[in-house]
């Protein structure tokens, strides 16, 4: 299997210092929680090693495995041209991917970077309570992502940027903005949370939901239980 690079350049509405903190210590706010030892050679999550550490400018980590396998994530930061509150991020994901895996990784990359942009724009520096739940195996079937959107009352004509009221499990009806929508993924932003729906049936996997909750007193166990019941009922 050949190695490949997935590269994206995005502009984020935050300073390089804020973005650097987000990709090193604030990953629970947009990806999932992880711990990084702040030095080259330090630990970066399970099995990873920090390979670049220049606060406000450059962070990278690498993991290696058997048979020459590796996985490397690289975040290069530059200040925006017109304002200190803008950062040009060049993100590179280098790895040995399975055949046919790259398109799915590219779509996930775009969604995660969008969530990073939402985090630094709306919730920067705030601690997130992270929850992730998986739907039953039956959600591997074609059309499962659309089924979730229908259950959330997000009709086909609801577009990115639209304001909606969504009945979220464990929360009830809440005002939200639809910030991301593709055939597979949906992003919602409320006043206190980022809700992410992953429909992975196109790649042989099921639906999952991640919630980054920035409210005081947020309860990951309660949020997870509410979403799990909702998904189990939907795909029973």
What are these regions (language model features)?
Residues 4, 42, 69:
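Short, glycine/acidic-rich beta->alpha junctions
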Residues 37-43, 52-62, 161-163, 181-187:
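Short, hydrophobic/aromatic-rich segments at coil-to-beta transitions
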Residues 58-108, 179-236:
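Beta-strand/loop substructures that line and gate deep hydrophobic ligand-binding cavities in soluble
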Residues 16, 53, 80-81:
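Short loop segments at secondary-structure junctions
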Residues 1-37, 103-160:
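Hydrophobic ligand-binding cavity/cleft-lining segments
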Residues 7-9, 47, 72-74, 173-175:
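Well-ordered beta-strand positions in beta-sheet-rich domains
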Residues 142-193:
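Non-catalytic interaction/regulatory modules that flank or connect domains
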Residues 34-38, 48-53, 77, 155-158, ...:
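Short, exposed beta-strand/loop patches in secreted or surface proteins that constitute
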């Amino acid at each position: 299997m050949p190695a490949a690079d997935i590269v994206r350049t995005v502009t984020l509405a935050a300073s390089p210092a804020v973005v650097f903190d987000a990709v090193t210590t604030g990953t629970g706010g947009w990806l999932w929680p992880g711990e990084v030892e702040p030095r080259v050679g330090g630990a970066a999550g399970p099995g990873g090693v920090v390979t670049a550490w220049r606060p406000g400018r450059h962070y990278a980590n690498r993991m290696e495995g058997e048979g020459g396998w590796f996985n490397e994530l690289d975040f290069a930061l530059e200040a925006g041209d017109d304002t200190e509150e803008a950062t040009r991020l060049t993100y590179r994901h280098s790895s040995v991917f399975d055949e046919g895996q790259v398109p799915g990784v590219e779509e996930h990359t775009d969604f995660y970077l969008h969530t990073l942009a939402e985090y630094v724009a709306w919730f920067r520096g705030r601690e997130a309570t992270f929850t992730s739940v998986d739907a039953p195996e039956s959600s591997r079937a074609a059309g499962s992502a659309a089924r979730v959107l229908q259950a959330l009352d997000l009709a086909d004509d609801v577009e990115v940027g639209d304001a909606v009221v969504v009945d979220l499990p464990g929360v009830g009806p809440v005002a939200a903005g639809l910030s991301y929508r593709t055939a597979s993924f949906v992003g919602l932003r409320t006043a206190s949370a980022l809700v992410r729906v992953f429909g992975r049936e196109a790649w042989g996997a099921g639906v999952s939901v991640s919630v980054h909750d920035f409210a005081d007193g947020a309860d990951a166990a309660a949020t997870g239980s509410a979403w799990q019941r909702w998904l189990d009922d939907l795909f029973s």
